[in-house]
Structures are given as C-alpha cells and as structure tokens.
Amino acid sequence: MSELTTIARPYAKAAFDFAIEQSAVEKWTEMLGFAAAVAEDETVKAYLSSSLSAQKLADTVISICGEQLDQYGQNLIRLMAENKRLSAIPAVFEEFKHHVEEHQAIAEVEVTSAQPLNATQIEKIAAAMEKRLARKVKLNCNVDNALIAGVIIRTEDFVIDGSSRGQLTRLANELQL
C-alpha cells in the first residue's frame, strides 16, 4: 500500500460518508474526479509542490476547478491544503471510488487476455464472475501477448489463470518435482 493511499483513506471515507448523508454520491464522484484530473496535470503538480501558503494553493486549485466544486468540495480542498495533502487528491478520488463500488456491491475484475476479447466473450466472463461473486462486476480488459493464449482473471480475492503461459509454468513446476 502506498503512502498516498494511506493519506487518502480518511479524506475519502469522510467525503463518502458525507456524500451518502447528503444523497450526493454522483455529485461527489464528479467533483473529486475533476479535482483529481486537475491535480494530475504536470503544471499543477509542480505548483502544488511549491512552498506557497496553504491558502494560496487551495485558492488556486479551487479557481481552476471553478464551478465543478460546490462549497463542500471547496472545503475539502482547503482542509487538504492546510494539512499539506493536496498532492493526494487523485488517491482520494480512487479511494472514494472504491467506497462507492463497495456500497453499490460492484466488484472490480481485471481480465488480461492474449488477444482482444469480443463483446460476446466479455459478456460471458462478466456473467460468470457475477454469478461466482454474487455481485455486479466491472471488467477492466487488457491485452498481454506474452500469455500466448487464454485469459487471466484477477479480483481482490483470487486469481484464475487460464492462460497457456500459466499452464506451461505449472507443467514445468510439476516436472521439476
């Protein structure tokens, strides 16, 4: 776990709890997503690492975000600036999204395949994973030619390696025993 994730966790939890309380999860997702995009800009990153006052840094981020931040979003930016944590805004957004997915019972599943998957294959994998996990899934599909053939499916809890590379590795391990 990275240091930024550790720093971001309490801010994300507080923002999520407040968003739930205010029935504004979608609004907060948009606000934090926009603020994270701003904070990830190279020029803004350099500015945030300067030795300017917290007030000046917060005012700058708030003015760049403009109307994308409501007063509560602005308060979060000010609080993070006072604590010298503005560089953690993208990590706060990522942690916030994890809270939202958990709240909505959505599991993130990473699917790595040797070749690009077609829509039918993606639907079948999604249906199988939803059945196995008993919750909705969000698939993130990647291509890795080194797999030779097949797929590797990763969730937070387990990995299913159905790739040719994985089968060859297991076979090699068996032969060495």
Curated annotation (Swiss-Prot):
Coarse class of the protein's main subcellular location: membrane
- UniProt xrefs under InterPro entries: ATP_synth_OSCP/delta_N_sf, ATPase_OSCP/d_CS, ATPase_OSCP/dsu
Q: Membrane topology per the record? A: Peripheral membrane protein
Any Pfam family: OSCP
Listed A to Z, the keywords are: ATP synthesis, Cell inner membrane, Cell membrane, CF(1), Hydrogen ion transport, Ion transport, Membrane, Transport
Q: What functional role does this protein have?
A: F(1)F(0) ATP synthase produces ATP from ADP in the presence of a proton or sodium gradient. F-type ATPases consist of two structural domains, F(1) containing the extramembraneous catalytic core and F(0) containing the membrane proton channel, linked together by a central stalk and a peripheral stalk. During catalysis, ATP synthesis in the catalytic domain of F(1) is coupled via a rotary mechanism of the central stalk subunits to proton translocation. This protein is part of the stalk that links CF(0) to CF(1). It either transmits conformational changes from CF(0) to CF(1) or is implicated in proton conduction.
Which HAMAP family does the record match to this protein? Answer: ATP_synth_delta_bact (MF_01416)
Q: What is this protein called?
A: ATP synthase subunit delta
Which species is this record about?
Haemophilus influenzae (strain PittEE)
